[in-house]
Amino acid sequence: MAFTFFHAYMPKVFEAQINAGLFRENDGIRFCQSIDIDENLKFNNLAKAGGKLYNFVKDNNCPLYIDRLQGGCFFEGYDYDMELVRTYSEMLGKKFFGFQMHEWMSNFISDTDKLVGGKCPEPWTEENITATLKRDFPFPHIFTEAMSVKEFAEVGHITELNKYLGVMEVLFLKRQKYTGEMLLPCDSAILGYSLEFKNGAKRVMPEIGQQTKHTSVQIAYARGMSKAYGKSFGTYYEPWGGEPFSACNYQKDGLNEWNISNDSFPFKTAGGNGGSSRSLQKRMYLYSYVSGAEFISEEWGLCNTFCDWNDFELTPYGQVKKDFINFTEKYKNIGKPITPVAAVIPKEIISLDNIDADGIYCSFNVDGELKRKLDIMRTGLRKLFAFGETFGNENGSLVNRLIPDAVDIVNEDVYDENKYTYAVNLTGDENFEKKYRCCSAEDVPDVLNRFLPCKVTGGLHHIVNKNSDDEYFLTIFNNTGIVRSVADGEYGLKEAEKTVQVELKDGRKLLALYGNFNMEENDSKYYITVPAGELFFGRF
């Protein structure tokens, strides 16, 4: 399947995206849906059969999905015209990606935290929930994200892990039934891929950005579980971050695709210098692509692509996006990332959360056998996804990993040894090693040096793609050294610059293709210097 970039649809802006060279033959449309969007711009009206959007999608057979059913904003409970939805599904087939189910597991926890923090009286009735949230969050709508107030009152105050996991599965199945099994899960802090694929998800989409740690873990788990189920994955980029914490909004009038403002929702935008850096945006896009993502979407793309919605001059954000789209057009055939090793985690872990946590799982205290297995899993993952020294203030999401980026993560109940050379047993079950070829987390660097077609030393994040036996691609990222703030914009620190040594096997030659770097060859070795926040992309 050709790579797809999803672009937001708004009538007054969409044609400008095409004219700017952003929309290509294989690209798709994300239909933005939230409670504050004007009714004439919501799905039942704007996407109606015979309308401009409908005809464009039909004529171009382009992918489409609805961003979003719920999550990350006030819960709406919009009454979709499901006959219209089925029309799009039948028209597009696999190119209709369905409804984004946004951060649904973590949103339930944050909703619960709001009620606990606000000392919502027990029992949690609709009246008590509404009164507590209206008092503490005096916005135009009741501030729940994971479910309606009525649904929250029905499940009540969840204080036990197993009940939480059960409620989450029931919620997912309920939304699957409503949408005709067309949910597109988008997870960040809690990755529910095991639960989601078991219950009919066709693809998953981790939300990546500066505010969520361990991007490599997010993607390695999405890739591993997608591979296990024979499905696909993409990524959803969000531009939050910086100092003070905010999101960027380059649109000079402050407009955005969600029709929200700083006084109507608990968030903060800070113009072009807000949020995380364009350096991180560039690396997030490229990393997704070389990691095997088949599509990318973005949370705040429309309000950051053009300076205004009259002249449509590209912003720095828009230029990064256009450069990336041109990159994927020029380098269409880079093959798949080489991942000979799988980190196999317990089947009980139906959602993967913070690998740095201790004694807590999905915000609940744990002990006994589950804690033992979590400790083994997290210790192993921290070794496999460890990173080196950091500079600047954009660290923790994309990092300079200490070993090659060539490890998937997969649950033990769907692990297929035919897809990997070795497994790292993080299941907590010693019998696993009697069934499968295994190596320890400590042995993985040596294993990868044997099986990868090149060796990179020097402390920078790198990943290798194989297109054929005669063509490989190497991407090297320097994921540290960027300073980003509203006051000063962004800049790179000289002390974060690093030089790596690249040794190719079988007498191959390395051809530099893209990036900001300096490369020298000496005695059949390549020395590549990459400044802070920059990257190297080459073929051999």
What are these model-predicted stretches?
Residues 4, 8, 30-44, 63-79, ...:
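The substrate-binding groove and active-site-proximal loops of carbohydrate-active enzymes
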